Amino acid sequence: MVMDLAVELIQATVQLEQPLGDGTRTVGTGFLISSTGPDGQPRTVLVTANHVFQKMPGATARIGYRISNADGSWSYSPQPVKIRDGDGHELWTHHPSRDVAAIAIKAPPEFAKAAIPQSYLAADETFQQYKIGAGDEMMALGFPRGLSANAAGFPILRSGRVASYPIAPAKIFPTFLLDFSVFPGNSGGPVFVSRDAAAVAPASNGDSAPAAGPGFIAGLLTQQVELNNERLEIGIVTQAKYIRETIALLTNPLAPSTVADTTPVPGAKAASAEEAARD
């Protein structure tokens, strides 16, 4: 069971990169989810934004794993993951109407244990259960412009407030806005409500309601909002419903998926892989 979703998601979030051969690299963010494979056995799934993989022209990307050492230090140990076959065909699965991608991977045992259970992906009723709406705080993890929190390669944790209304149901509102500054490299990172954010919810009589639980993953960051080439410091979050559906498509390509409203958010621009981050 997840005890502190912020800490657990920090452990499960990784930098994705691919060198471009000219001294630059394209960078994005991904996170690990634990789900059940077609054989009924547990598997580790890497989730990111579809455009992160699409903007990587090579067959192999690198996942920024982190290895803990006996003395309490950490080592950054990026490992290859194949994202295309020899003919250039995509090996990942993507949602038919939303910017979400998933690929089953064989992670080091330490990282496989860090994967977040799929049950922590939000459903429509989750927002109601936690009383989350416009103005409430959510957290986001990522690697803005390829920058990590330290030499060990941990992601940078930031926060913002829900900036749109309403945010459910996901079929009608497949994305929502988050009031925080987004940079290339952030795309694909998880957006979530932590245990602390949901622990104290006002009751109707003015008292505090019991803790709603350790939190949930609301979705993943996919775009930023720009107007006339000016960044508005607003992120676009794709709802977790579409992560669930993409993972289901890994097992069964005929699994049902929601054809969501595809009307673009004015000024939306992908938040990774459109600019290469220098090493």
Model-derived segments and spans:
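A conserved glycine-rich beta-strand in the N-terminal activation segment of trypsin-fold
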Residues: 19-45, 234
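Short, surface-exposed loop/strand segments
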Residues: 1, 6, 22
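Residue-level recognition of beta-strand microenvironments
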Residues: 33-35, 165, 194, 223
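Serine endopeptidase catalytic core focused on the charge-relay Asp
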Residues: 10-14, 18-20, 27, 56-175, ...
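Cytochrome P450 catalytic-core helices
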Residues: 48
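C-terminal subregion of chymotrypsin/trypsin-like serine protease catalytic domains
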Residues: 6-9, 193-279
